[in-house]
Design a protein with these regions (language model features):
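Active-site beta-strand-loop-beta-strand hairpin of nuclease catalytic cores
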Residues: 96-111, 116-117
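Hydrophobic, Leu/Ile/Phe/Ala-enriched alpha-helical segments that form helix-helix packing faces
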Residues: 39-46, 68, 72, 76, ...
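Acidic-residue sensor for enzyme active/binding pockets
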Residues: 61, 83, 110
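Ampiphathic alpha-helical segments that act as solvent-exposed interaction surfaces
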Residues: 27-35, 130-145, 211, 215, ...
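Interdomain/boundary linker segments immediately adjacent to catalytic/signaling cores
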Residues: 2-3, 7, 11-74
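A short acidic/basic microdomain associated with nuclease active sites
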Residues: 73-101
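Non-catalytic C-terminal interaction segments of nucleic acid-processing enzymes
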Residues: 164-223
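Catalytic cores of nucleic-acid endonucleases
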Residues: 111-170
Length: 223
């Protein structure tokens, strides 16, 4: 009964955010909440690919960007573009993993799937460059400098032992590097996914906005 209530509560919160979005009044906070919800829905609805990725600690950014773009379109987003130029004006030549529009506002999403080295049953013991993985997320935040869009950084930390909180150190480090205050409550969702009949693992979905003010402090505009 406790689990059912918890699931209902999560669904209610996600639906509430979605209803607010449908009303056409969207803040950056609502946008990153909704993208985080979308990613959770995509991961939960594809147990086969996710189980393989978890067991092998294999990154899945390429698959995720197309799956997420498809999911966003199904939810009502428009002008979906994968590998979208961040700057329409051409000032910044970088590309985001995918972009979409809602109510005339463009959002650009940078995606990463950093894998961990933590040991857990049912997962191959493979070494992964954890420090490099999380440094790349900081770089994503630093390149999101544009007058033309609302940049969001999203990433999925995997695999994680069920209930483990060690991933919080990486969220705090990313926030420190990008001069942002990031928290579990506002920017992260921890979910459990099955990887075999006998084993499950957690993943953490994080998403946060990069304000233009922060981006301008972090990245000089190219001339």
């Amino acid at each position: 009964m406790g689990r059912s209530h918890q699931k209902s509560e999560k669904c209610y919160c996600a639906q509430a955010h979605h209803n607010n979005w449908l009303g056409g009044i969207v803040t950056m906070a609502q946008a990153h909440d909704i993208v985080r919800t979308w990613i959770s829905e995509v991961l939960r609805s594809h147990p086969g690919p996710m189980a393989i990725a978890m067991r092998q600690r294999a990154k899945f950014e390429g698959w995720l960007k197309f799956s997420l773009a498809t999911h966003a379109e199904l939810k009502g987003a428009t002008d979906i573009v994968v590998e979208a130029p961040i700057s329409v004006s051409g000032v910044n030549r970088a590309r985001s993993d995918f972009s979409f529009k809602w109510d005339g506002v463009r959002y650009d999403v940078e995606l990463k799937t950093p894998n961990t080295n933590w040991r857990m049953p049912g997962v191959a013991e493979l070494h992964r460059p954890v420090t490099k993985n999380f440094s790349s997320i900081v770089e994503d935040g630093r390149k999101a400098n544009s007058q033309d869009c609302q940049p969001l950084v999203a990433f999925v930390i995997f695999p994680i032992p069920i209930g483990d909180n060690r991933w919080l150190q990486y969220l705090e480090r990313i926030g420190h590097e990008l001069q942002l205050t990031l928290s579990r409550e506002a920017h992260a969702t921890q979910i459990t996914l099955p990887i075999s009949p006998a084993h499950s693992v957690d993943v953490v979905i994080c998403c946060f906005p990069i304000s233009l003010r922060v981006a301008e402090q972090l990245v000089p505009i190219a001339v």
